[in-house]
Amino acid sequence: MGQTVTTPPSLTLDHWSEVRTRAHNQGIEVRKKKWITLCEAEWVMMNVGWPREGTPPLDNTSQVEKRIFAPGPHGHPDQVPYITTWRSLATDPPSWVRPFLPPPKPPTPLPQPLSPQPSAPPTSSLYPVLPKTNPPKPPVLPPDPSSPLIDLLTEEPPPYPGGHGPPPSGLRTPAASPIASRLRERRENPAEESQALPLREGPNNRPQYWPFSASDLYNWKLHNPPFSQDPVALTNLIESILVTHQPTWDDCQQLLQALLTAEERQRVLLEARKQVPGEDGRPTQLPNVIDEAFPLTRPNWDFATPAGREHLRLYRQLLLAGLRGAARRPTNLAQVKQVVQGKEETPASFLERLKEAYRMYTPYDPEDPGQAASVILSFIYQSSPDIRNKLQRLEGLQGFTLSDLLKEAEKIYNKRETPEEREERLWQRQEERDKKRHKEMTKVLATVVTQNRNKDREE
């Protein structure tokens, strides 16, 4: 190999076509430049144990996943496809990845605490009591009576890969801890099992189904704004759920019912059905094709078959397209014009609010270069009066970009007087007036005194 050091990130670049194919099979897209940035910089700087070189243990991958899927503004929805693809490579490695996997394998002794379990019952009469802790299966999931597919959980919980030893030992209560609210992953055996997917490989290599829990839906609704208030944020959340959880048709309906209003659901479904592709790849208007690809009633799709999974993949893609289509609002520039800079608000904060208004009340993207002129005019004329007046007097204003105007506005803002400075200036001005008035009064008095003296002399 000479001086070349091969690391897992560099190895993925050497087999980039296979990495992209792996991502595409999961219905997601990844780009090489961002892949490099995340693997070698951003995930390292999260300080959760992601190494600059070498293969991260799966528990560290889970730590990165927690950061990415964190609710609200602390999450990174744009990184979901990349960590999902990395997780897939680590848990189901191709041949060119396996030589780099020995470091994660030492954690596999984690199932060893399970091995004393079968050998212990013959040695003590206390162990026959343990089976009584196995039958209580409610801890597998929080109660979720609304799911019509909950009866599928009567099968074994998702097995630990490799089908270790006696299956009953894998059913111990600690191993069946509740699914985490965002990833629904098991933390007891992170080195082998944490997939964060409801469709997992179960007994006899059959996919096993895990529905959303009530706590999942509650947390997603609680920690994210309504669709009517911020459609982009909620669309990003649902996209990350669709990518990582690979939900079934029933899951998708449950998700929409929990996160959207009835009117919003109707708009989303209508927009999604408009995007159903025909034989030529363009949106079709044939009702039978639309109903087959995006049915409004529960279809007979078996997620255990390749055909069923392909139907679900297309359905999820169309649902995401419907969310994006429903997020586009009719233009309401009057609402945009109501966003004006506050008296003490910084130009950067005002510009951020202005861009958010464009996203919320118009179908335009304020980051689009084609919309730069409109955003610039709004920024100038809706700034505070002192900043607006000085920006309007700039020479060559037509050649300024939005970044240039923001810098100029920051300069003007930073040169503003503080309340103390303004008070000092007004006090000095008043003092100068008083001095001037005093001098004038002195002159008048001096003139009067002089005139009186002259009269006295004449008399």
UniProtKB/Swiss-Prot annotation:
Region annotation Disordered: where it falls in the sequence: 97-207, 417-459
- Lipidation sites of kind N-myristoyl glycine? G2
InterPro entries per record: G_retro_matrix, G_retro_matrix_sf, Gag_p12, Gag_P30, Retrov_capsid_N, Retroviral_Gag-Pol_poly, Retrovr_matrix
Per the UniProt record, the source organism is Feline sarcoma virus (strain McDonough)
Give the Gene Ontology MF terms in alphabetical order: RNA binding; structural constituent of virion
- Any other noteworthy remark? This protein is synthesized as a Gag-Fms polyprotein.
Q: Which GO terms describe its biological process?
A: viral budding via host ESCRT complex
Q: Where is the composition biased (Basic and acidic residues)?
A: 417-434
UniProtKB keywords: Capsid protein, Host cell membrane, Host membrane, Host-virus interaction, Lipoprotein, Membrane, Myristate, RNA-binding, Viral budding, Viral budding via the host ESCRT complexes, Viral matrix protein, Viral nucleoprotein, Viral release from host cell, Virion
Positions with biased composition (Low complexity): 122-132
- The molecule here is called Gag polyprotein
